[in-house]
Amino acid sequence: MDNLERKIETGSLYKLDKNFLLTKVDKKYRITNGPAFIDKLNFYHTDSSKKKIYKIKINKKNKILKKTLFKKFNSAEGSPDGMTLDKNKNLWVAHYHGACISVFNKKAELLTRINFPAKNITNCAFGGRNNNELFVTTAKKGMSKAEMQKYRYS
């Protein structure tokens, strides 16, 4: 990621099929993240730079049937980055520059927010023996010495 990506919509969403054929599904993103699939034809996808999460419905040929804004973050919340779904289809979203993970229901209502001692949360995924442990990744990029002291686990 560089500063140019924050201004120009060069990012795209692709699908790689079982025969390794690459198909562009959507374009005009700045910094793409996700996706997190609800089912075979519905998923969430982010444009981190625009601070937006979209809900996308595709058909069996991977054409977008509907793309709606699911959630727009404000500056204080940071940017939505990686994400995952739990067994109840709640969306868990990593906040880059936000030091937390938020959990939203299908109506985009905030269920809970989990604060972390790391400023840049980049992704989260469930794993472990019973798939009930959350694994989280972080980044230090662009952090000052003072921020590194405050967010020791970055």
For the regions a language model picked out, list residue spans one by one:
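Short loop/turn segments immediately following beta-strands, especially the blade-tip
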Residues: I56-K63
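A short loop-to-beta-strand structural motif that recurs across blades of beta-propeller domains
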Residues: G11-Y14, K52-Y54, C100-S102, S154
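A short beta-strand motif characteristic of beta-propeller blades
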Residues: F20-K27, K66-F73, E109-I114
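Conserved beta-strand positions in repeat-built beta-propeller and related beta-rich domains
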Residues: M1-K7, F43-K50, L91-Y96, F135-G142
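Beta-rich, blade/repeat-based domains predominating
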Residues: M1, K7-L13, L22-F43, F73-N90, ...
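Flexible "stalk/tail and boundary" regions
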Residues: K18, F70, S102-T112, K119-N120, ...
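Short coil turn/linker residues within repeat-based beta-strand modules
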Residues: K18-F20, K50, K60, G98, ...
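Blade-level signature of beta-propeller repeat domains, shared across WD40, Kelch, NHL, RCC1
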Residues: T122-S154
